Design a protein with these regions (language model features):
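Hydrophobic alpha-helical membrane-insertion segments
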Residues: 37-51, 172-180, 388-400, 477-500, ...
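N-terminal signal-anchor/start-transfer transmembrane helix
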Residues: 9-27, 219, 223, 287
């Protein structure tokens, strides 16, 4: 049994779990167990399938005829699709284990229906990655969008429904762009099979039009700026294990689509240099603005969602370097760029999945998303705190964890641009490096804020004081992802050549010899630190703060006196502790043009409180893009809809007239 057949069994299990959940409506507890266990087994089979495929290193193709010539079912598993399915399967296994007990809070609230849409969502993502026909690709893409949309609106409250509608609009706008791109290629090739697209040699203008349509269409799904507005609204609205899958792997379908079109389907045409520069520019902007908006958030899941925009930007930055390398026929740039992109794609799926599961554990105990109402959870939820600490260190790209490794390779790809003689790239490279450096510093600040406000200090609410650790299956799921973050970092010298082999196979570039270790000199892979020495350094570095603390403690006087913290003559209250808003305030001032700040005035003055109630702080910071672009578009659409509504008179005869008029217009258009 080959890898494609194994994957078919995995898909069958997902579909079985989906349909079984549908038939178990009203039996939520049984539906949760059946759905979770079946999808877990499907994920394990998917992992085995893709490891087998990547080890074999061959491309598998299966073709099934249908009654429609344009919709023949063709499956193709190459190195990139196998890698992507492996990433999805890893996260599916962990999220399925997590959902066994997490979904109990949704009993009686449509848990069986959520199981149906969750497994349909997973199946559509996996099948889409191996689909080699444009018609079925779009069908599965729509199925993925619709099933995830139902997960977003699962709570059926006003916030989730509004988030779902915005997601629905942007997702389908992206689908239309992708559809037009495929139809343009289909018109030139006479077929909707991707195999025929690969043989096309399009004119530069048409190729650029196809690329731009596909780039912004898939970019909407990836959550890149300026098509990101749905992401910080939709991901927090979904159940936490669904948020982990949406943020960890669904947005990567957008990255996969960009790679597929630009570096596979249009490879025969050739890539203009400006394509790669455009992708780099949007990636750098997404990374920097994404982390800035993450810093401004109080909602823990919105913070993580904005961080996804940042990490998608980092991945696109590396993808842009790979595209530049392909356009310049530079194997080193191409392969190192793809190495950084794919490595970070894998790492982000792991640590972002971990953090969303951790956020779900906290919310299930405290029943709030507001970090200002948390605090001191490290004492009450120690396992969750430990797992989230590893996730925060990893996403901050601090050694010795996996985020550091993949961002290091992204840095290497940017350093390698110095070898290129093109003036535009010699300017773009340093600018991108500066933006990535600022992004990295802000990311550390962001997750210090998140961990400190959430897990440290004093409890800021009754729920925080009474919080308890989550059930064992949720803990094990989080610890598995935390262990993978550490394991991948320690095995980077073994894993990097495997990912480079995927890059070679996907781009059909000559092999680039890279010895074990991590390059330290820009543009070359000859001067290195040995893996054993690097591992020793990475393991020793985190111990230095602890050793310094022990040294300082030994120098303190033996006699100590403890008392309340000084609070300017007032009695100490937990609300006086540093807040997330206080951490962000300097950046809000420096980058005030990027935020819309609101100040609410309270006309009531209380003599005993002085001026304490004159002003109330804004509970949220709204990005300028939402205020100046998205909101006007939504308002204009609503006004247009009200005008069109006048056509809905309720007169059946008038409706028949509309049909006849539309038919006449179409006949005239065809005749002309």
């Amino acid at each position: 049994m080959d890898a494609l057949q194994l994957l078919t069994w995995s898909l069958i299990l997902y579909l079985f779990a989906s349909l079984a959940s549908l038939f178990l409506l009203g039996l939520d507890r049984l539906a949760i167990k059946l759905s979770s266990i079946t999808s877990l087994v499907g994920g394990v089979i998917g992992i085995i399938s893709e490891i087998t495929q990547l080890h074999a290193g061959v491309t598998l193709v299966a073709h099934f005829a249908t009654p429609f010539d344009f919709a023949d079912l063709t499956l193709r598993m190459d190195s990139l699709s196998a890698f992507m399915v492996l990433v999805i399967s890893l996260l599916v296994v962990v999220c399925s284990l997590y959902s066994l007990t997490y979904m109990r809070e949704y009993e009686g609230k449509g848990a069986a229906a959520m199981g149906f849409f969750m497994n349909l969502f997973i199946a559509s993502m996996v099948a889409l990655l191996v689909m080699d026909n444009a018609f079925w690709f779009i069908v599965l893409f729509e199925m993925m969008s619709l099933s995830s949309w139902f997960l977003v609106i699962a709570r059926q409250d006003k916030t989730s429904i509004n988030a779902g509608m915005l997601y629905f609009f942007i997702a389908h706008a992206g689908s239309v762009l992708i559809m037009i791109a495929f139809l343009l290629m289909g018109r030139e090739s006479g077929s909707l099979d991707f195999a025929s697209f690969r043989t096309l040699s399009l004119s530069p203008g048409l190729a650029s039009a196809v690329f731009l349509l596909a780039f912004f269409g898939f970019g909407a799904k990836a959550g890149m700026m300026p098509l990101h507005s749905w992401l910080p609204r939709a991901h927090p609205a979904a159940p936490s294990h669904a948020s982990a899958l949406m943020s960890g792997v669904m947005v990567k379908i957008g990255i996969f689509g960009i790679l597929k079109v630009a570096m596979d389907l249009l490879a025969q045409t050739g890539l203009p240099l400006w394509w790669g520069i455009l992708v780099m520019a949007i990636g750098a902007i997404s990374a920097l603005l994404g982390v800035l908006y993450a810093l401004a958030e109080q909602d823990i899941k919105r913070l993580l969602a904005w961080s996804t925009v940042e990490n998608v930007g980092i991945i696109l930055l590396a993808v842009g370097v790979a595209m530049v390398g392909l356009s310049l026929h530079d194997p080193l740039l191409t392969v190192v760029g793809l190495l950084g992109a794919l490595f970070h794609l894998l790492n982000h799926a792991l640590f972002k999945g971990l953090l969303f599961l951790g956020a779900g554990a906290i919310i299930s105990r405290l029943h709030t998303h507001d970090m200002e109402k948390m605090g001191a959870l490290a004492k009450r939820m120690p396992w969750t705190a430990a797992a989230c600490l590893i996730g925060c260190l990893a996403i901050s790209a601090l050694p010795p964890l996996n985020g550091f490794i993949s961002e290091w390779y992204t840095w290497q790809s940017l350093f390698s641009l110095s070898r290129v003689e093109a003036v535009a790239l010699q300017l773009a490279g340093p600018i991108a490096m500066v933006m990535l450096a600022v992004t990295g510093g802000l990311a550390v600040m962001c997750f210090v804020k998140m961990y400190g406000i959430t897990f440290c200090g004093a409890p800021r609410s009754t729920h925080a004081e009474e919080a308890q650790e989550v059930p064992n299956t949720m803990i094990v799921a989080m610890l598995l992802l935390a262990a993978l973050c550490v394991l991948i970092a320690l095995s980077a010298s073994w894993l990097a050549p495997k990912i480079m082999h995927i890059a070679h196979a996907f781009t059909d570039t000559p092999p680039v010899t890279v010895a074990s270790g991590i390059a330290l000199v820009p543009g070359t892979f000859h001067t290195r630190v040995t893996p054993s020495l690097l591992l020793l350094l990475l393991l020793a570095m985190p111990l230095l703060p602890g050793l310094y603390w022990l040294w300082c403690r030994s120098r303190r006087a033996a006699f100590r006196r403890t008392g309340d913290a000084w609070a300017c003559g007032y009695s100490w209250e937990n609300a006086m502790a540093p807040s997330g808003n206080g951490v962000m305030q300097p950046l809000r001032v420096v980058f005030s043009a990027l935020f819309r700040l609101r100040q609410q005035l309270d006309p009531t003055l209380r003599l005993n409180k002085g001026l304490a109630h004159v002003t109330a702080r804004a509970q949220s910071t709204e990005p300028f893009w939402d205020e100046r672009v998205i909101r006007p578009i939504v308002s204009a659409t609503q006004r247009l809809a009200k005008e069109i509504q006048h056509l809905q008179s309720g007169d059946f005869r008038l409706y028949c007239l509309y049909v006849v008029a539309a038919l006449v217009v179409l006949l005239i258009a065809i005749a002309v």
